[in-house]
Amino acid sequence: MNIHEYQAKEVLRKFGVATLKGKLAHSPEEAVAAAKEIGGSVWVVKAQIHAGGRGKGGGVKVAKSLDEVSEFTKKMIGMTLVTHQTGPEGKVVQKVFIEQGCNIAKEYYVACLIDRATGRAAMMASSEGGMDIEEVAEHNPDAIKKVDIDPTVGLMPFQARELAFQIGMEPAIVNKAVKFFAGLYNAFVATDCSIAEINPLVVTKEGDVLCLDAKMNFDSNSLFRHPDIVEMRDLNEEEPSEIEASKFDLAFIKLDGNIGCLVNGAGLAMATLDIIKLHGAEPANFLDVGGGANKEKVTEAFKIILKDKNVKGILVNIFGGIMKCDIIAEGVIAASKELGLKVPLVVRLEGTNVELGKKMLKESGLNITPADNLTDAAKKIVAAIKG
């Protein structure tokens, strides 16, 4: 689950991470009032969407007067902001964050994340803050430094100091950086983050170490432990079909292709997406029905897939372990009848009760194309949508 920048800063402040004064606004009038309350003579108007790269897209503006605060807010509210993370369709800006300006001397990058290679948390930092870290990794990988964190003791002060020196921080601010890094790590662990990213962390000309922008993503499996975090969820920033899928415990991610996929198991689902692309087509979604799906769940999955007007065909790929093939077949038949399915449907079944499942599909009288294996399934659905 993602949250907005202003919410991430609220969370981080609780753990001692220093931020600038800021206030949320939904209109030019609120923005001006916020700027007056914050004080000073320079403010930053920031569009609040669940995506990075806002500055390049025109979603971050420095205002040097209250009139400019009003002007920039008026332009941002309601605009469709397109960044490298939103895709070409962009996201509509519904609110802005008015933040105090500061005298930036140097920008850095720092993040806590899970290192899949070690199975531990890690802290990454770079002297090249304010840039997309993916670009830094590609063009100057040596600029990124990393420390692995032992979960039994957490981030040790010597590790934080070492990281600060590795990215070129001045000795005079290292102690402040150590406190900052510790707060970031503590927030990461306490709230069950999958990533907590500060980009940029800035050192001001006055020698302060501050969080200028923040991104936090939380493990959705842990949200039952964090009702305060759940309250921060902004459904307006999420794909409606993904919200609907979550109500039925379906793991669903909308994609840009035209072949709908219904699969059990995340690994098999990813392999299914890959083989569709291998055969020259594009998947419309990732959908894992899980191991305990029933007829009703399969029907809801079909409904969600078919709400996407780009879907020209559906591939069902099931390996029956806990999930029995006859249960899937029953769900496929029920969904096809209830929805009056008009797009090609290819079904590949393997595993528990596979023969019974295939028999049910064959005797259903519906236009369902069986497939013997994954390659056969991909070839058949691609051929079907291409006519």
Curated annotation (Swiss-Prot):
Signal peptide: none
Xref: PROSITE patterns: ATP_GRASP, SUCCINYL_COA_LIG_3
Cofactor note: Binds 1 Mg(2+) ion per subunit.
Its EC number(s): 6.2.1.5
Residues binding Mg(2+): N199, D213
Cofactor(s) it depends on: Mg(2+)
Gene Ontology biological process terms, A to Z: succinyl-CoA metabolic process; tricarboxylic acid cycle
Domain ATP-grasp: residue ranges: 9-244
Quaternary state and interactors: Heterotetramer of two alpha and two beta subunits.
Official protein name in the record: Succinate--CoA ligase [ADP-forming] subunit beta
The organism of origin for this protein: Bdellovibrio bacteriovorus (strain ATCC 15356 / DSM 50701 / NCIMB 9529 / HD100)
Gene: sucC
